[in-house]
From Swiss-Prot:
Gene Ontology terms: biological process: iron-sulfur cluster assembly
Pfam families registered for this protein in UniProt: Fe-S_biosyn
Similarity annotation: Belongs to the HesB/IscA family.
NCBIfam families the record matches: iron-sulfur cluster assembly accessory protein
PROSITE patterns named among the record's database cross-references: HESB
GO molecular function terms noted in the UniProt entry: 2 iron, 2 sulfur cluster binding; protein-macromolecule adaptor activity
Protein name according to UniProt: Uncharacterized protein in nifU 5'region
Taxonomic source organism: Azospirillum brasilense
Record-linked Gene3D superfamilies: HesB-like domain
Coiled-coil annotated spans: none
Length: 125
């Protein structure tokens, strides 16, 4: 199951409000093939039939069944720093990540943080 930190919930509550919420539903988190490490996270506002529904106070998120194994145990946070602000995925299923931290690799038996890897894109932990 995906977990959202308080910072992520607060940011999403402000971002997904009003007409957007009424017309498009809630936030959908998915994993797709791509990125320099093999998989990338996707966030959008369109739910699809069959998605798992998770509620965090005022925020509802959807996770598609195909992405669920990659997202089990993931903690989504919202962080602000000198390089900007954005959502950070801490993924215990990742066996490696690219240097920019935007994509990850996953394989059987491995576990590490999806924090940016030293040495640049494609560097495994």
């Amino acid at each position: 199951m995906v977990t959202l930190t308080d910072a992520a919930v607060n940011t999403l509550e402000l971002a997904v409000t009003g007409e957007v919420r009424r017309r498009r539903g809630r936030l959908r988190i998915a994993v797709a093939d791509g990125g320099c490490a093999g998989h990338k996270y996707q966030m959008g506002l369109e739910a699809t039939a069959g998605d798992d529904v998770l509620t965090f106070g005022p925020v509802t998120i959807f996770v598609d069944p195909t992405s669920q194994p990659f997202l089990t145990g993931v903690v989504v946070d919202f962080v602000e720093g000198v390089e900007g602000a954005g959502f950070k995925f801490d993924n215990p299923n990742a066996t490696g990540s690219c240097g920019c931290g935007k994509s990850f690799s996953a394989g059987p038996g491995g576990s590490c943080s999806s924090a940016p890897a030293p040495g640049g894109c494609g560097t495994a932990h």
